[in-house]
From Swiss-Prot:
Pathway: Purine metabolism; GMP biosynthesis via salvage pathway; GMP from guanine: step 1/1; Purine metabolism; XMP biosynthesis via salvage pathway; XMP from xanthine: step 1/1. InterPro entries: PRibTrfase_dom, PRTase-like, Xanthine_Guanine_PRibTrfase. Its main location: membrane. One of its GO terms (molecular function) is xanthine phosphoribosyltransferase activity. Homotetramer. CDD domains: PRTases_typeI. Purine salvage pathway enzyme that catalyzes the transfer of the ribosyl-5-phosphate group from 5-phospho-alpha-D-ribose 1-diphosphate (PRPP) to the N9 position of the 6-oxopurines guanine and xanthine to form the corresponding ribonucleotides GMP (guanosine 5'-monophosphate) and XMP (xanthosine 5'-monophosphate), with the release of PPi. To a lesser extent, also acts on hypoxanthine. It comes from Sinorhizobium medicae (strain WSM419). This is Xanthine-guanine phosphoribosyltransferase. Guanine binds at D102, I145. It holds the Pfam family Pribosyltran.
Amino acid sequence: MSLPEKAFPVSWDQFHRDARALAWRLADNGQEWRAMVCITRGGLVPAAIVSRELNIRMIETVCIASYHDYDTQGQMKVLKSISPEIAKSGGEGVLIVDDLTDTGKTAAEVRAMLPKAHFAAVYAKPKGRPLVDTFVTEVSQDTWIYFPWDLGFTYQEPIAKGTRG
């Protein structure tokens, strides 16, 4: 796989710094979070870092598949919903965390589930930016972010090659 013209490769160190910067911004918000919902799979790594920094212990996941191939976004499919215990308040006191808000489709889907929640992402693109409350870095819509869990020294196919997003 060749890198597109506007590639933004992110190292583990860079991602860790950016996720901690997100935690700092959220801490400055002054909000007490009763729970965190991370959007899997991309939100797992920043959720681990942010939850540690903000001492959030109740962590839930929501799984929405939108990339059925590595680089092709398709129809949204909810693979795992948010627990009724977290969802019952409409998201009040809940922090949603993801790595990136790109087109905003996934964010809109989760926002509909938790309309009162605070949505945070490490990176945001212009189409998804209106749906996120807190983010660290904005990149152009035509930039492809290469996350460290997708890369080795070159692009790495997932071990389970036959699986889709």
